[in-house]
Amino acid sequence: RSLLHRVDLTDLAFVTIDGEDARDFDDAVYCEETPEGWRLLVAIADVSHYVRPGTSLDRDAQKRATSVYFPSSVVPMLPEKLSNGLCSLNPGVDRLTLVCDALVNRKGETTAYQFYPAVIHSHGRLTYTAVWSALQGEAWGLNTVGPRLGELKRLYALYGVLRAARSERHALDFETEESAADFAADRSEE
């Protein structure tokens, strides 16, 4: 029943890209070049398959609205069995997702898109640091991303085109940095 009416995308090399300390992987990307530009697929974990509307699990998740991360612990929006297990797009396992499948031309314009339920198989858990290192040609990053380098270069090329199109539209750019607290062994702030 789980796979009924889902598109099988397990042959596409989706990857997750998150921070080093991420524990749940709720989105994955795949990009291929087309004659007109790129096909970009963004998959998010299909939590709705496991959390039915109106259930106590659903009500609790609505109250929490998000997971809250502390330096050495987390208060998850969903039980860990879901957030880090069944709904986490871990590498090497098939997972139920909702996918946005978009075509983007060389001017950075989205020419077509559709949403659909799918099954994906993550081919790698990557970090922002490793991806950037690989794109810079550094040995550590290249070793870490391995055979995914070509896909990452396509994603980065698409990013460049989208960034240029955004600039052309004079869109606002909000530069933000993720904040983090460092604590000493005795739990005092450093």
Task: For the regions a language model picked out, list residue spans one by one.
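Electropositive polyanion-binding surfaces
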Residues: R1-E189
